[in-house]
């Protein structure tokens, strides 16, 4: 599948549809597995998450899937949208713990599936390969399998060695944020990719918000292209990753992160979130590009 999609660098305009944030947010059903792209405090789909939280009613009983989860994910946890979490890290990097996730984890308000970088990588690889599991020596000799009874062991038929069989990870909806999208449906990301490319090829539905609309994506050494038809829907969302960074357009808004942490630690999450949601998203000119 990877090689097939990679070969289609400039596709058919009919393959991908440009929509607005409100329409995109309506595509996330209750109870689904929602993956959010980016890494820690870099290029997270914050504008999409805020629009999701403007929905009435808000989505519920979601399983959050992130290689690393951060600010945008903490908003969803604090708003009561998340039932289960699958990630190997949930925090705000140098700005500390993710306060709403930490509180929910401490009170038992979330189902947390124990994950490591290896377990997520193997589960994603299995899904991309179309197989039920991916064998690995990761977790051998640790107590981690005791925390995940769904993770089984297999015997290597060639060596007789016992291996961990990490099950394939399913994903209903993946949302990424990129630099540019064109009318053909191609998307340009910067090179701090995380597992964004893998999310494109393992998820049932892919939505990408972008900083800019261009006539035709141009290749460059400091960026990567998600070729059409990797994303089913594109959304024009300028500054859509703020307050996380979107290199080279803007840096991490450190003061906003500190304001968020202070608000949550002082019991002010609802007031903080309410202030964010009252701000209208930027004009979505991309909705007219379909």
Regions found by a protein language model. Name each.
Residues 14-290:
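Conserved alpha/beta enzyme-core scaffold
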Residues 2-3:
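Tryptophan (W) side chains
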């Amino acid at each position: 599948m990877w090689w097939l999609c990679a070969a289609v660098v400039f596709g058919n305009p009919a393959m991908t549809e440009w929509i607005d944030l409100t329409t995109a947010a309506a595509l996330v059903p209750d109870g689904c597995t929602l993956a959010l792209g980016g890494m820690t405090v870099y290029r997270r789909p914050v504008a999409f998450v805020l629009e999701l939280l403007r929905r009435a009613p808000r989505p519920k009983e979601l399983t959050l899937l992130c290689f690393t989860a951060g600010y945008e994910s903490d908003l969803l946890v604090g708003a009561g949208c998340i039932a289960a979490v699958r990630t190997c890290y949930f925090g705000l990097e140098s700005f500390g713990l993710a306060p709403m996730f930490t509180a929910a984890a401490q009170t038992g308000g979330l189902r947390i599936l124990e994950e490591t970088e290896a377990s997520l990588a193997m589960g994603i690889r299995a899904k991309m390969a179309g197989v039920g599991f991916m064998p690995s020596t990761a977790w051998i000799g640790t107590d981690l399998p005791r925390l995940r009874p769904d993770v089984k062991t297999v015997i290597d038929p060639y060596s007789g060695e016992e291996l961990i069989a990490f099950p394939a990870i399913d994903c209903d909806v993946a949302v990424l944020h990129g630099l540019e999208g064109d009318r053909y449906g191609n998307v340009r990301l910067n090179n701090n990719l995380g597992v964004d490319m893998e999310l494109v090829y393992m998820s049932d539905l892919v939505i990408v918000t972008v900083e800019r609309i261009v006539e035709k994506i141009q290749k460059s050494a400091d960026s990567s292209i998600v070729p059409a038809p990797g994303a089913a829907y594109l959304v024009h969302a300028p500054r859509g990753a703020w307050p996380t960074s979107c290199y080279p357009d803007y840096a991490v808004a450190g003061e906003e992160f500190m304001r968020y942490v202070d608000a949550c630690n002082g019991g002010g999450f609802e007031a903080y979130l309410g202030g964010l949601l009252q701000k209208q998203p930027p004009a979505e000119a991309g909705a007219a590009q379909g």
